[in-house]
Every structure is written in structure tokens, then in C-alpha cells.
């Protein structure tokens, strides 16, 4: 399984709030869109690490995958860096020391997507 990318995974069971996919990936009901999910079938979710919830998946469209360049929207900035919208609900962090130019909220910027040391999706310029 590759984090930060689409993966073909089998649906193992239905839980209270999500479907459990092979590899321990949780696919929340609200991340399924209009796709009918059947136990035993395969789905193609985008898989990412959520620090609080563990391995998560979405069947929605994301704006880029790990190993790719992507134009992402800056939704907020802080002393740490900029938070970018990848389309997964959680924002991707572009650390200040990874910025080649200063960015501000509302900008659309070109970044490379990678995994950090905790397998979370991160951005760099």
C-alpha cells in the first residue's frame, strides 16, 4: 500500500462510522460519495495518514498525489508555514523552511507532494 496515492483495496467490513478496508484503512461513509460499497468488493481510495484517526481513505477527487507536482490553494498561514487544500478534508503543511517564496492565504501555488517522517502528506517548493 502506498500512502498519499490511490490504492486498490478490498472492503473487509462495515463498522459504525466507516468501512474497514484491507490494511486497516478506514473509509468514512461521507468519503464514499454516491459509490455503492459492497463487502468483499475492491475500491480505489486515496489513502493518507491522519495523526488522530490513523490510516484513512477517500473515494473523492484529490488535487495531487505523493511524488507529483500540484497546484494547491493556501487556506491559512501560521508561524509554522502554510496549510494547503488537497481535497481530503485535512490540510497539507508546507513548512516555512520549505518555501522558496513567501505565500499568503488565498494564493494558489505549485508544490511537490511527499511523505514526512510520520507518513503524513507534506509539501515542498
Where are these predicted regions, by residue range?
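Single-stranded RNA-binding regions, centering on S1/OB-family and related RNA-binding modules
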Residues: 1-125
